[in-house]
């Protein structure tokens, strides 16, 4: 597949349906929708576009398991839901992931693809597998067993992260030039990241100045989230081998650009406004959250010195 990138909206940082529509071509087969940072995307609008163009919606809820969207869990709204289980997610098994679907034909294809096109767990209805290219995407039994036990803890882990995020929100609420996480109506946020936007004009100094000051105070915060279209693989258009595949494939006659500027909202937020506190790599105590709030207030009390 050849990815075509749509821009994001700046409230929940998820894909912007308007940008998705602008980027659909005759070659488009699916829309991959990450539910980013812990908040579901604008899924009804995206599903409407998918229905109009007969596309599959693959909802990546790796950062948002158990988040709610209009009464449904993230990952169960699109045609397929996927979530990874590596070490910095809400729960983890070391490696591996999960696919969700209520479509039996899609489920069967995924079950075959995971193991070289073979039905190894249970008999499948597919009579002729000659058109099936399979891979080794098997999740080991040990990892699966760990995952089952981790799932039992998920509700309490997420509840604790929401409590800590609420405490952060309350503590940072009155600091000028900051926009704290937005939670849309009929949605819940499970805070894989506590995302913050800096308004440099209101604050009077740059995002990077306050970021560096916060890091100096020991705050576990980042100021970058990869803009994928600017990564070397897309800039050089070389993914497999050294000859430019898949972009040089004779099957693909379209044109795709990955120039800086095609996703202006994502680029501006990454370059000038975004900061984020990871909430899943470490289980914060209330005392540690208080320390983060104290560090923010200390930096803000000294903004004039930092300018």
Residue ranges and their predicted role:
Residues 1-61, 68:
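PLP-dependent aminotransferase-like
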Residues 117-118, 215-221, 296-304:
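A common structural junction motif
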Residues 4, 57-58, 82, 179-181, ...:
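Structural detector of well-ordered beta-strand residues that form the stable sheet scaffold
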Residues 20, 31, 35, 60, ...:
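Generic structural signal for small/hydrophobic residues in well-ordered secondary structure
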Residues 64-70, 74-193:
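Active-site region of PLP-dependent enzymes
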Residues 203, 236-307:
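PLP-dependent enzyme catalytic core of the Aspartate aminotransferase-like
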Residues 181-260:
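Conserved PLP-binding catalytic core of the aspartate aminotransferase-like
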Residues 24, 47-56, 93, 98-116, ...:
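Basic phosphate/pyrophosphate-binding loop/patch that engages nucleotide-derived ligands
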């Amino acid at each position: 597949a050849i990815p075509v990138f749509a821009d994001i909206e700046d409230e929940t940082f998820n894909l912007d349906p308007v940008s998705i529509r602008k980027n659909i071509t005759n070659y488009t087969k699916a829309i991959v929708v990450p539910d980013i940072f812990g908040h579901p995307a604008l899924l009804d609008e995206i599903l409407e576009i998918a229905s109009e163009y007969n596309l599959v919606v693959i909802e990546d809820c790796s950062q948002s398991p158990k988040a709610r969207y209009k009464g449904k869990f993230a990952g169960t709204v699109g045609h397929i839901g996927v979530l990874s289980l590596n070490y910095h997610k809400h729960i983890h098994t070391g490696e591996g992931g999960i696919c969700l679907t209520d479509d039996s034909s899609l489920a069967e294809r995924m079950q075959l693809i995971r193991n070289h096109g073979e039905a190894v767990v249970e008999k499948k209805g597919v009579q002729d597998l000659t058109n099936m290219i399979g891979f080794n995407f098997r999740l080991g039994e040990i990892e699966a067993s760990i995952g089952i036990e981790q799932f039992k803890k998920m509700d309490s882990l997420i509840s604790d992260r929401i409590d800590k995020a609420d405490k952060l929100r309350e503590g940072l609420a009155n600091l000028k030039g900051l926009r704290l996480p937005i939670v849309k109506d009929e949605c819940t946020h499970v805070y894989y990241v506590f995302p913050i936007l800096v308004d440099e004009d209101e604050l009077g100094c740059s995002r990077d100045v306050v970021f560096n000051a916060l890091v100096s105070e020991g705050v576990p915060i980042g100021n970058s989230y990869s803009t994928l279209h600017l990564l070397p693989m897309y800039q050089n258009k070389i993914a497999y081998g050294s000859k430019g595949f898949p972009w040089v494939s004779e099957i693909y006659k379209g044109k795709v650009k990955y120039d800086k500027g095609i996703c202006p909202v994502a680029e501006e937020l990454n370059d000038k406004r975004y900061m984020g506190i990871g909430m899943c790599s470490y289980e914060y105590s209330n005392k540690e959250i208080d320390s983060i709030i104290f560090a923010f207030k200390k930096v803000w009390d000294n903004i004039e010195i930092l300018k």
